[in-house]
């Protein structure tokens, strides 16, 4: 297994990113300005995009694991990689996600705690309702992990 940074032609990996953020125009907002990593284990199993949010905060804008490989530790491996790589540069690793029973427990298992929320984020910023695990996503829930 190896994790590598992608500096060029990031759009070649868009299909996996769209699993975590299904509106391409929203992905486009952070894809080029962010730093992208792919986790390969023979082929691409997972990927993420992070951005510098200032004040010592590194934000995971998108993290996605190939559906056939979910639950095998690839997502956690990416988060642990980010925490280790950026521990000297940042004090906080942050992620924003929908209030979903599929994602919140994953981040909590990875050491994140709830920080704050942006009410109506998904209804205000997406052109169609977003559902995850049968639940419509409305608010953006932010979780943070100290580095």
Predicted regions and their residues:
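Conserved N-terminal entry element of GNAT/NAT acetyltransferase domains
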Residues: 1-9, 141, 147
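Acetyl-CoA-dependent GNAT
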Residues: 4-67, 79
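Short hydrophobic/aromatic beta-strand or adjacent loop that forms the aromatic wall/cage
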Residues: 34-36, 137-142
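Short glycine/proline-centered loop/turn elements that form peptide/ligand docking sites
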Residues: 65, 79, 100-103, 120-126
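Conserved acetyl-CoA pyrophosphate-binding loop and the N-cap/start of the following alpha-helix
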Residues: 69, 73-81
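Conserved GNAT acetyl-CoA-binding A-motif
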Residues: 85-99
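Conserved catalytic-core motifs of GNAT/GCN5-like acyltransferases
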Residues: 94-96, 108, 113-134
């Amino acid at each position: 297994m190896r994790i590598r940074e992608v500096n060029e032609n990031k759009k070649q990996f868009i299909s996996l990113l769209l699993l975590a953020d299904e509106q391409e125009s929203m992905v486009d907002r952070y894809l080029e300005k962010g730093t992208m990593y792919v986790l390969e284990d023979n082929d691409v199993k997972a990927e993420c995009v992070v951005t510098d949010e200032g004040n010592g905060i590194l934000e995971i804008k998108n993290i996605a694991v190939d559906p056939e490989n979910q639950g095998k530790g690839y997502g956690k491996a990416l988060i642990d990689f980010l925490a280790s790589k950026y521990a000297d540069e940042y004090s906080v690793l942050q992620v924003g996600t929908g209030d979903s029973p599929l994602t919140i427990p994953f981040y909590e298992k990875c050491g994140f705690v709830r920080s704050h929320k942006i009410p109506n984020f998904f209804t205000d910023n997406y052109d169609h309702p977003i559902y995850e695990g049968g639940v419509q996503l409305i608010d953006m829930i932010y979780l943070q992990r100290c580095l």
